[in-house]
Amino acid sequence: FISLILAFLVVLLVMPKAIPFLHQLKFGQEIREEGPQWHQVKSGTPTMGGIVILVAMIVSVLGAVVMGDLSTTQLSLLFLTLAYGVIGFIDDYIKVVKKRNLGLNSKQKLIGQIVVGLLFVWLSGGFTSEATYLSIPFTDFELDFGIVYPFVALFWLVGFSNAVNLTDG
């Protein structure tokens, strides 16, 4: 719980300073003219704000280390988030610094997400028979995916990552 509060406070304190700073650096994405008209108001909106979110996560994990409350699950989730964050950073970097509005193409992003997802599933034991259950919250029911679990987990990770990216953009 303390890690959650710590991450929230970091974002709350840093983001208001980061947005004008990113504006100063002209880290805004140009919006393509062929897009919807209502999307044009986003032109110049600073990109790379995800860096603040990643910093907040790192600070909260460091807080957990100080409190002696860090688990391997938290470390693997940190790896997953940072690795997906690196993909997002590369995408934004190409858009802003290289002035290529599309950033990484969809195939490059998908390959990166699949590689990261496979690493995460492997590191978290998803390829062992012990980690194939999905517990349904507030019930005693567990759904066993068996040998298809790694594929279900990978599909979920890549799908969730893209859903977050779509709603953010």
Predicted regions and their residues:
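"…together with the soluble PPM/PP2C metallo-phosphatase catalytic core" -> "…together
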Residues: 1-169
